[in-house]
Amino acid sequence: MIETSQTIPELVSWAKDREFSLNLPTERLVFLLAIAIYNNERLDGEMLEADLVDIFRHTMNAFEQSTDAIATRANNAINELVKQRLLNRFSSEFTEGLAIYRLTPLGVGVSDYYIRQREFSALRLSVQLSIVADEIQRASDSAEEGVENNESEHYWRRNVFAPLKYSVAEIFDSIDLSQRIMDENQQSIKNEIAELLTKDWQAAISSCERLLDETSGNLRELQDTLNAAGDKLQAQLLRIQDCVIGRDDLYFIDQLITDLQSKLDRIISWGQQAIDLWIGYDRHVHKFIRTAIDMDKNRVFSQRLRNSIHHYFDHPWFLWTAQAERLVDLRDEEMVLREDDALGELPEELQYESLSDLHDQIVEHMQGLLIAYRENNRPIDLSLVLKEQLENYPLSRHFDVARIIVDQAVRLGMANDDLSGIYPDWQAINKRGAEVQAHVIDKY
């Protein structure tokens, strides 16, 4: 068996011979986490059985379970953790009934995953990468010195292999584990967003935006940190690899370098892929929100407005409208439903005018401007045209009029100032504060 890995059959046989197994329901897992937190607060790291019973009682209170026979149930839970090699029990004839307990490496690893490993930030990643860079730098310097002095295998194992194996590789594994925790965090955020949108999407839009932006920012910040250090780390690994090329007795270092390069590539690659996947999900959520808003606008708001009109005399209200022609649509629909004749005349500002007629009028006016340009060589001031035209239409038509004029202006020509990169000044085009930023069209 090589020193850097184990084969699958060997690992299977090893686990089978030792009868490894894990069975941690929520209550047992919470008990283990409580033990780990309590253990961190102690200086000696040792716990008595009475301490564990008190911890068990506290966790059962959180689950609102009965405290009957609490000592027996706590003893059963402790024995299960000992059997699964999560706790070690130490006792002797001198300490009968006063056993001492310590968390095993497995217990520390499981609790560490749920407690400390979730504290993942760009600062922590930067510190880890800084430590890795220092270790690889020392290893590469030692490798070059070993080549110059023709050092023995013992030198290479102590000064090159050991730092890479027991420091760099473990930090890479820690970063990889942190990325997998970030994957879980993304899934939990997706579930939270789905739950928010299912319950009340109107109130949840701001919360969804915050969750999406925070996650996108975290992923981008972490990936930028990885990209900044990745190339330098790869260069140092290549320095070490160049030193062991052709040295059959140092095959274990060459193989370790290859493994580290693969780990680093995988970490950086998955970081970028996670960002791309999250961007796709972000777009999907925004599309869903836009669709939901459109559906609500057509379905809920119109029904609410009809009910308000129907009960107007019982509950009077004021109506502020931004598009007056919508009242005409509502009036026509009511007339069809009731099959009654509408009496009276609409105010002038509510008279219906088709968009095609409006378009033809504006096109005709723009053609007149072209004739003036051809005869007098007079440029077209788009802001002045917009201001003059908007004065002839009600406020409800201003957006459509402005859109048609701008569309026609783009077809007519362009401004020389556009090519020079000069930004035009903002010009007011109506009394409601609307402004436009456009150069004078002087090139056709």
From Swiss-Prot:
Recorded family membership: Belongs to the MukF family.
Places the protein is found: Cytoplasm, Nucleoid
One example GO MF annotation: calcium ion binding
UniProt entry keywords in alphabetical sequence: Calcium, Cell cycle, Cell division, Chromosome partition, Cytoplasm, DNA condensation
Name of the featured protein: Chromosome partition protein MukF
Organism: Haemophilus influenzae (strain PittGG)
Renumbered residue ranges of the record's region Leucine-zipper: 212-240
Xref: InterPro entries: Chromosome_partition_MukF (IPR005582), MukF_C (IPR033441), MukF_C_sf (IPR038198), MukF_M (IPR033440), MukF_M_sp (IPR036141), MukF_WHTH (IPR033439), WH-like_DNA-bd_sf (IPR036388), WH_DNA-bd_sf (IPR036390)
Its biological purpose: Involved in chromosome condensation, segregation and cell cycle progression. May participate in facilitating chromosome segregation by condensation DNA from both sides of a centrally located replisome during cell division. Not required for mini-F plasmid partitioning. Probably acts via its interaction with MukB and MukE. Overexpression results in anucleate cells. It has a calcium binding activity.
Source organism superkingdom: Bacteria
